[in-house]
């Protein structure tokens, strides 16, 4: 498969996300939440999610319930969540931008006032998404949180992860586009936020797309994807389980598998067929693997062109020349180098957030980090001596642009400062 073919796949995937009928349906939900507040959220949640809420307070999750969820976990699972949280914290602190304080020019950072989080819960429970989104915000200095998560099954482990993070207020058992709208615009019960983060289904993604600009969002997530490049020294079953791990996310997930020989690709295909019946989530995997794409690459140039064209959410390089190859990967949500850096470890305990750009958007965006929960501004404090040096240039530029009040604003300060300044 050539680069143009891969480009067409990505283009088709993006087009599928712009369903007009879905957009209109979601816009109606948003409009209703904006105009009716809690009543609309209750109505849509009962209608779509099979709940029987009578009022908005009914879907507020109490701090006691969150604590009870944590207490119910086994010590081993508590320890696993703590290990994951600690690794995320360490990574996020290591990449947190620091203020630059200069004598005349500074650049300073400020945490967002209120951050909102959507934790999916339809086909599976995702306590890992709690940690991968909330912990970066904590490291950034955010202190006010709003969390929405749909309730379709036992959500205790998701609630437990929130308790571990210290997020025990403004947690709501709702999902869907109505949850996004409620966080974006606020209701009588649900506070308005400054930014919404977290993945969801196609309706959640559309809602985030439509409220973007009224609030900030992390990204518009499409179906999850992985690009695997492997040589024939890698055990076939390990590759198959990497593919299954990607496929079991949901039916729309996809894998791009690049190999050096057709015979090795055939071995992988045969083991997929043999192992699929043994998988607990085989129905989802079976649907997902129909989205897979396989290709044989015979030159390094061809490989790198494909890697950077697809700009996949996850890029896994398990190859004898992996150092050289990874050095040339310019566009990817996250790169997993080597046999022991499988994508599944990145989904849980590696450290970087698993909220990553999909659908080729890694060509211009990056995965969620602590820096995404802060704003920044320059602080400009020009002193008299510097003014004398740079004012003439400013005056001439203002005159050239025909902005004469700008020119006068600069020129009028040639006299001494009215207060003590050097």
Language-model regions, residue ranges each:
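N-terminal Rossmann-like NAD(P)+-binding subdomain of aldehyde/semialdehyde dehydrogenases
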Residues: 1-113
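Short acidic-hydrophobic, aromatic-tinged amphipathic segments that line or gate anion-handling sites
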Residues: 1-5, 170-175, 294-299
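Flexible, glycine/charged-enriched surface loops at secondary-structure junctions
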Residues: 96-101, 216, 253-258, 278-287, ...
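Conserved small-residue-rich beta-alpha loop and adjacent elements
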Residues: 98-160
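Conserved NAD(P)+-binding/catalytic subdomain of aldehyde/semialdehyde dehydrogenases
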Residues: 167-254
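A glycine- and small/hydrophobic-rich beta-loop-beta segment
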Residues: 249, 257-328, 332
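C-terminal core of ALDH-fold dehydrogenases
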Residues: 308-422
């Amino acid at each position: 498969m050539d680069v143009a073919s891969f480009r067409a796949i990505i283009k088709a995937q993006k087009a599928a996300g712009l369903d007009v009928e879905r957009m209109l349906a979601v816009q109606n939900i948003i409009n209703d939440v904006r105009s009716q507040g809690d009543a609309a959220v209750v109505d849509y949640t009962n209608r779509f999610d099979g709940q029987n809420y009578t009022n908005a307070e009914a879907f507020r999750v109490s701090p006691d319930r969150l604590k009870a969820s944590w207490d119910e976990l086994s010590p081993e699972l508590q320890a696993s969540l703590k290990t994951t949280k600690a690794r995320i914290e360490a990574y996020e602190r290591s990449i947190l931008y620091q203020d630059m304080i200069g004598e005349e020019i500074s650049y300073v950072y400020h945490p967002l006032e209120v951050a909102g989080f959507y934790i999916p819960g339809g086909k599976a429970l995702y306590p890992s998404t709690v940690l991968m989104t909330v912990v970066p915000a904590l490291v950034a200095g955010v202190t006010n949180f709003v969390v929405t998560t749909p309730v379709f099954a036992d959500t205790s482990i998701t609630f437990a992860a929130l308790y571990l993070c210290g997020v025990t207020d403004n947690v709501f058992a709702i999902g869907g586009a109505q949850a996004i709208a409620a966080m974006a615009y606020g209701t009588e019960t649900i506070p308005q936020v400054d930014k919404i983060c977290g993945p969801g289904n196609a309706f959640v993604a559309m809602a985030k797309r439509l409220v973007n600009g009224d609030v900030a969002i992390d990204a518009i997530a499409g179906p999850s994807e992985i690009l695997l490049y492997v040589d024939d020294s890698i055990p076939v079953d390990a590759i198959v389980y990497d593919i299954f791990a990607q496929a079991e996310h949901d039916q729309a997930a996809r894998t791009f598998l690049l190999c050096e020989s057709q015979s090795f690709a055939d071995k992988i295909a045969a083991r997929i067929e043999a192992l699929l019946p043994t998988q607990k989530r085989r129905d989802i995997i079976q649907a997902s693997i129909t989205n897979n794409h396989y290709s044989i690459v015979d030159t390094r140039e061809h490989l790198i062109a494909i890697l950077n064209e697809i700009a996949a959410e996850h890029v896994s390089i398990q190859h004898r020349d992996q150092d050289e190859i990874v050095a040339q990967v310019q566009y990817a949500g996250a790169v997993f180098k080597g046999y022991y850096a499988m994508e599944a470890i990145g989904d849980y305990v590696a450290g970087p957030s698993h909220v990553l750009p999909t659908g080729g958007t890694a060509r211009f965006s990056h995965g969620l980090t602590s820096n995404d929960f802060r704003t920044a501004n320059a602080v400009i404090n020009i002193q008299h001596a510097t003014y004398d040096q740079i004012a003439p240039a400013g005056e001439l530029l203002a005159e050239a642009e025909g902005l004469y009040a700008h020119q006068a604003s600069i020129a009028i300060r040639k006299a001494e400062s009215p207060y003590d300044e050097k």
